[in-house]
Amino acid sequence: MKKRTVGLLLLIFILSASPQSYGQEKLLNPGELYDSSMELYYKGRCEEAIQGFLKIVQSTPASKLVSYSQYMIGLCYLKMEKHEEAIQQLELYLKTYPEGDRIKEAEQGIQIAKEQLRGKPSPQPTVSKPVVKKSLPEEKKVKRRICAQVSYLGGKNLEEVEKRVKELKNAGVNTILFRVFQNKGDRVYKFVTAHHEEGVYFKTEYAPVVDDILGKVAEIVHRNGLEIFAWITTRYANYGLEGHPEYRCKKYNFETKKMELARGFNLFHPEVLKRLEGLFRDLGRYPIEGILFQDDLILRHNEDFSAEANKAFLKDFGYSPHADLFYIDPYKSDSGKYYTKGYTDRFMSWANWKNRWLMNVAKRLMETARESNPNLQFAINLYFEAVINNLNGVAWFSQTLSGALENNFDYYAIMAYHRQAMKDRNIEAKEAIDLMAEVAQKAVKSVGDPSKVLMKVQILDWKSYEVLPQKEAEEILAGILNHGEVSLAFFPYIEQFPFHSLKEKWTPSKKSSE
């Protein structure tokens, strides 16, 4: 009897101790678990990634990350070429989340899996190739673009504007990236009648209209056989809203150790998102081929601590963002700027979360603009750091190429500004040119189709206002084009730059004859 009693007590102890010891294991919150699972996915460790995504689905049903996790389970199976399982999981996503953000991508994934099951030859599995590239629409081929990015035109009237467009056409340019926003203090187009110091160049009720000129410029561009993308801001499109601090982003001041208003919109505020949707909806009504997101669709390492952002993060992660949790040994440099010696794991979770939020905002705006023009194409500006170093990209800008790839932009516009890199990194021209060639190589490898990689070449030194010498332009083009016939954008367009002399450098005929 005594032995039975002891045995029973031992059994009770074991049963009661087991859950306790399990509970002492480090359990990641949904956001951290999602980030770690995504990292496994990109490393090709899909079975492990599936386990992480499943934990989110099963243990945190109220999290916004559940729908994304269900979608990613399907992508993992697709990447492993388990096509029946992929179809099952992606169809489950469509059924469970009919209003989800990944509806189109899930449908494309199902289509690809079904084609493989019908007997089409399967591609050789590669660990490094994200399945996102497979899930792009097979029938939708983008053209290679040679662009002039226009931040300013010196023409005094539309006749002179047309003359510039004809010159670009003859030089081999096929696309104009036209600035349709006006920041206070920047140069105003000479051919417009400015009604406001800041705003936009198309008709809308969601921002001050400097002048409704986009339609006329588009007509000129099309008349001369070119295409036009409207280049527009997002975070910095807070024109005329200085009196609304609640719409502003908040940043942490390392010197005062306090929060303060930062430049630009708080993209977590519902009214701000409605305003941007209205802006993009109106822009989409114009006869344009596409829209280029300005490089302001970022959040730096000390932005956004707004109330709305903090509340949204708390809901997903279970704790509020705080500077004390994020930054390792901040210090003031000789230049007066503040840097940190490192970032905590919690900071990286916050930065990755901000990246996802920004990409979802972009997706929302693309869908809104396509309501009136379903054929609109979209390009997103990316810092080159987001291509060569995911950790730096997400830490400094809340931006990564891999994150952008998940949202299926038509073009990935990489700001390969070598002169700027020389200044920022204190390096010589050759090293900067080689760096941009490396950026092109990595971008093409990640994106797949070189035409979708839009390498932006700096042709004016911002500091000295020197136009890039032709020899230097040839060197950077040679380095970039060595990795494929990528699309190109010359920035900023300036009349003195020798486009005609460089035309043969980017044409396929020249490349194939060498």
Region annotations inferred by a language model:
Residues 27, 57-66, 93-109:
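Short solvent-exposed coil/turn linkers within tandem alpha-helical repeat scaffolds
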Residues 401-514:
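Substrate-binding cleft of secreted/luminal carbohydrate-active enzymes
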Residues 160-187, 285-290, 404-412, 480-488:
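Catalytic domains of carbohydrate-active enzymes, especially glycoside hydrolases
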Residues 171-210:
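Aromatic-lined carbohydrate-binding/catalytic grooves of carbohydrate-active enzymes
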Residues 139-148, 229-286, 335, 339-347:
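Active-site-adjacent "subsite" loops/lids of carbohydrate-active enzymes
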Residues 227-234, 292-299, 329-335, 343-397, ...:
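Aromatic-lined carbohydrate-recognition surfaces of secreted/lumenal glycan-active proteins
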